[in-house]
Design a protein with these regions (language model features):
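C-terminal motif of bacterial Sec signal peptides marking the signal peptidase cleavage site
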Residues: 16-18
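Aromatic-rich carbohydrate-binding modules that target alpha-glucans
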Residues: 32-74, 82-111
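Extracytoplasmic
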Residues: 64, 72-76, 95-123, 129, ...
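Extended glycan-interaction surfaces of carbohydrate-active proteins
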Residues: 191-199, 231-280, 304-336, 384-419, ...
Length: 959
């Protein structure tokens, strides 16, 4: 009810007969807010969820407020409801302080916005408590004022608004101080203490001088819990394990929620959530975390989570495959098969199976086999390139397009869908291997088939991803008629290739020696992207570091192992949490460029969560698997510790022995005690296992042998500041731009770049390391050109956007065409369209291979998310109606109401002079799965959707 109406209603009673004079009978105006939904400040501190403190508290009269504890630096945010149905933003310039500013509904396009998603931006020069006051006059706009909160205002929302970090050590008997050197010659101090070192369950205190992410308190108390614990003479070692186990317990929840599902209402599930800022379960996060020891630490909860990420088809679909599929979560262009790393699930399942026994093993093994098999068969159709023998799709986990791919790919996501990624192919290899193993019991024919698939895929990966010059596998291959090996490298893919047996021993050793590290750890991607803030770009991710540690152990690269261990320890200790990510040249959870006179839009990591699940898994893996040596790959518990002299001399300097207690495995508790050698000044070797014994009660005792020095090294980057944005030692150059024109019988290609370039036609290198200028070419047939920049260190950029010229055939489809925009009409092809044929046949002008793609619009969701990537089977038939070629077209989201894009292509061989016809048939996408029935956007609660508006089918000769 609007205030003016309330005033009128009350006034009408004054002095009139029949209006009760007793105050108890007087009508009470109802204060009903204009916006009925709960509202949140989403994005501040990198938290895009609906945290308690981010909720705007209704004060009455359409006014709201909250106080947030905010870290220094730049933030993007919106005023929004839990389901993103309501979004208000101040999008044309950064928000100011102490000034009421109007926030408008998010525009339909981002043309007038400061950033790609029309977010508000604000920069906090000081960390602290800030008050956000919001009011509404009507639904068309919100007014918000940001001010520094007073002490009284802060305490209203944070009962512990001020906490002296020294308090966490009061009354403690033992204390240990550790200094962590910074890039600028300063150091951070972390103090560890324990109240009673001999207590059955100890109390630890940890405080840090590091400026913490999200302005969190500088100290915390950890009370040890029942379950696994480590006991040593080093307070820091024991305290950090206790902290990590506490965070694992905090991540164990009974319900999950996400703004995209069930309108952000809780979903009952006894699982692990993904992080302090991520309250849902995602396939890859859980799978990698499970593989990194969580499946051993809590098999039941991991099994619940893995089962949650399996789904049958909806009852309203044709249920193409009998049984369940692994869920590919919302993602680039509407998800699968642009994103195809759902096979990571198999890594978590394989580790879980090693911890199960008896009927529990049998039941999960059968379910896992069927789900993996169904998934592999589906991927073999829609995401497998028979010509290369590789699987297509986005890099695993590196799913924020411009962070690792070309700058233009966020606006043309199908280029990512047709690329091939190292990591995604390796996790397919692992899934196929597990399927082959399980099929020995359930389907002997498939066991043979999957074994052959795995061998063929391993060969294809080595043939096409290996860069002998760099001594590493490239991160991805770009499809330009022929695949181009891009000069980019990612540690997750490299490490997975090593530990999965794809890389030979010689290749594995080269990779670990050649992949660049900083003194603070290994970046997930190299070289870095210019003009892109920190997230995947320029970042350490602890779970990837844990995989690099596994690879270092396997290759006996002591230098790489030490780098990984110190990186994991430093990250957890200085930040008082297992963070999502860290800037790679500083080891910090946040780097503020404006502190150094640089562009604040490069600040980051732009999102960073405490107690990130796979980071927790990574730290536990370092302790449990590497240092204490617990391995279960065979289904039995084996103890094979890997302790370097650096670990002995630094991390465990005060200990004579270390013990892991209360480790449960298949219904029995075990402990591992390792006697340590004397401290030395030699940090270059490791101590081999000399002897392992176990008594009847499950107590392992390990004796280490004499120090073994090995010839190991890493490529260490030094002297580059973390805020430097153009240093060619660590950055690749920006990709070029091309203008291509047909001139008489030739083609003119104008290349713009400040660097030398490589120029390609249809995947063939036609100009190598030449000046960026105009070039002439005389192609035969249809030609697509792209270029790469090359900097002074020899690093090549991501590919430029291809520009194509040449003759083409265009085929309209049967159906009712409707105008989309000037000169473009389209026919809607939905899941219910049946077989949609070409409106006319066509004749092949020459014999050869042709590419077929669709010119389409799909605006069912945002470019970066969703489940409605349109997937259709395209058949090419001869004049007798025989199918001569077929393949699956992907028509990912384009993010524009009237925009047009080309789908991913398929290739078919045609004969000169013969007549052909095309036909489109429905396939499926992730919206067809039951698990997405509660998804609140297209393809979710209103039913599955596999739809595009198609103008025509383009046919081009690939010569």
């Amino acid at each position: 009810m609007k205030p003016s109406f309330i005033a009128l209603a009350v006034a009408s009673c004054i002095g009139l007969a029949g209006c009760g004079s007793d105050s108890s009978d007087a009508p009470v105006p109802v204060d009903k807010p204009i916006i009925s939904a709960d509202l949140y400040l989403r994005g501040l501190n990198g938290d895009w969820g609906t945290a308690e403190h981010a909720k705007l508290n209704y004060l009455g009269n359409n006014e709201y407020e909250t106080v947030l504890r905010v870290a220094r630096g730049s933030n993007q945010f919106k005023i929004a409801d839990p389901g993103w149905q309501i979004q208000y933003t101040y999008f044309e310039e950064p928000a100011a302080f102490d000034k009421a500013q109007e926030y408008l509904p998010k525009p339909d396009t981002n043309e007038a916005c400061m950033n790609d998603d029309c977010n508000s931006e604000i920069t906090f020069e000081d960390k602290g408590y800030y008050k956000f006051s919001v009011s509404f006059a009507d639904e068309s706009r919100a007014s918000m004022t940001v001010t520094k909160a007073t002490q009284e205002e802060a305490e209203k929302y944070y009962s512990d608004a001020i906490l002296d970090p020294a308090m966490v050590h009061e009354g403690h008997q033992s204390k240990e101080v550790k200094l962590f050197a910074n890039y600028d010659d300063s150091s951070d101090t972390v103090i560890f203490s324990v109240k009673d070192p001999k207590a059955e369950l100890r109390e630890f205190g940890i405080s840090t001088t590091t400026e913490l992410r999200d302005a969190l308190d500088q100290g915390l108390v950890i009370n040890e819990q029942t379950g696994p614990r480590v006991v040593s003479g080093d307070v820091a070692f024991d305290a950090l394990f206790a902290l990590t186990m506490k965070e694992l317990d905090q991540l164990a929840v009974s319900e999950i929620k996400d703004g995209n599902y069930n309108y952000n209402n809780p979903i009952k599930a006894e699982v692990f959530e993904t992080g302090a800022k991520w309250h849902y379960v995602w396939t890859r996060d859980l799978a990698y975390a499970a593989d990194l020891s969580l499946a051993l630490m809590n098999p039941t909860r991991v099994q619940n989570g893995l089962n949650f990420k399996l789904s049958a088809f909806r009852d309203t679909t044709d249920q193409q495959y009998d049984g369940e599929q692994i869920v590919q979560d919302t993602g680039t262009g509407g998800s699968w098969p642009i994103s195809t790393d759902r096979t990571t699930w198999a890594l978590g399942a394989e580790r879980l199976l090693s911890a199960l026994d008896g009927e529990e093993y049998n039941q999960f093994a059968e379910r896992a086999y069927k789900a993996i098999s169904n998934t592999l068969e589906a991927d073999r159709l829609a995401a497998f390139d028979a010509k290369s023998g590789l699987y297509t799709g986005e890099q695993s986990f590196l799913d924020w397009r411009e962070q690792t791919y070309s700058t233009w790919t966020p606006n043309d996501v199908n280029a990512i869908g047709s690329s091939k990624a190292l990591s995604t192919n390796v996790v397919h290899y692992r899934a196929i291997q597990l399927a082959a193993k399980l099929a020995e019991k359930y389907d002997s024919t498939n066991a043979v088939k999957y074994t052959e698939w795995a061998e063929q895929l391993k060969t294809a990966i080595n043939d096409q991803f290996w860069n002998a010059e760099r001594g590493m596998y490239v991160s991805y291959l770009f499809d330009n008629g022929k695949d181009i090996a891009v000069d980019k490298y990612d540690m997750l893919g490299e490490a997975l290739a090593i530990i999965s047996g794809v890389a030979s021993d010689a290749q594995a050793k080269q990779i670990m020696a050649n992949y660049p590290h900083s003194e603070f750890g290994v970046p997930v991607y190299f070289p870095q992207q210019p003009d892109v803030p920190v997230y995947h770009n320029r970042a350490i991710w602890p779970f990837v570091t844990a995989y690099s540690l596994r690879a270092a152990h396997q290759t006996q690269n002591v230098a790489a192992a030490n780098n990984a261990i110190q990186s994991l320890v430093r990250g957890t200790a200085t930040n008082l949490s297992n963070m999502e990510n860290l800037e790679w040249l500083s080891g910090k959870s946040f780097i503020i460029h404006s502190d150094h006179g640089e562009d604040p839009s490069m600040d980051g990591p732009v999102i960073n969560s405490q107690r990130q699940l796979w980071s927790v898994g990574g730290y536990l893996n370092m302790v449990v698997e590497t240092l204490f040596g617990i391995h279960t790959e065979t289904g039995k518990l084996e103890v094979k510790p890997f302790i370097t002299s650096w670990v002995r001399n630094n991390l465990l300097a005060q200990s004579e022995q270390i013990t892991l207690e209360n480790f449960a495995f298949k219904g029995k508790n075990y402990s591992v005690t390792i006697d340590l050698p004397e401290v030395s000044k030699d940090d270059t070797g490791y101590y081999p296992v000399e002897n392992v014994t176990m008594d009847d009660e499950g107590h392992f005792h390990v004796t280490l042998g004499a120090l073994v020095n090995v010839d190991s090294s890493i490529t260490l980057v030094s002297g580059v500041k973390p805020y430097a944005s153009e240093d060619s030692r660590v950055y690749s150059p920006q990709e070029p731009t091309l203008v291509v024109k047909s001139v008489d019988n030739s083609v003119s290609i104008d290349v713009t770049s400040k660097y030398n370039v490589n120029l390609y036609r249809n995947g063939e290198l036609i100009q190598k390391n030449v000046i960026a200028q105009s070039y002439s070419d005389t192609p035969t047939g249809f030609a697509c050109y792209l270029a790469e920049s090359i900097n002074d260190k020899g690093f090549r950029s991501n590919p430029s956007q291809p520009v194509c010229v040449g003759e083409e055939i265009r085929i309209k489809l049967d159906g009712e065409y409707q105008p989309l925009k000037d000169n473009v009409s389209v026919v809607t092809v939905s899941k219910d369209s049946g077989i949609v044929k070409g409106a006319e046949s066509f004749t092949a002008p020459v014999t050869g291979t042709y590419q077929f793609d669709a010119w389409y619009n799909n605006n069912l969701g945002q470019l970066n998310t969703g489940i409605t990537n349109t997937v259709k089977l395209l058949e090419v038939l001869d004049d007798a109606g025989k199918v001569v070629g077929q393949g699956y077209l992907q028509m990912g989201h384009i993010g524009e109401n009237q925009g047009m894009r080309y789908s991913t292509p398929i290739e078919v061989t045609l004969e000169q002079g013969k007549t052909y016809q095309v036909a489109l048939k429905d396939h499926f996408n992730m919206s067809y799965l039951k698990s997405n029935e509660t998804y609140i956007y297209a393809g979710g609660i209103e039913g599955e959707k596999n739809e595009a508006q198609i103008a025509d089918i383009r046919i081009t000769p690939l010569m």
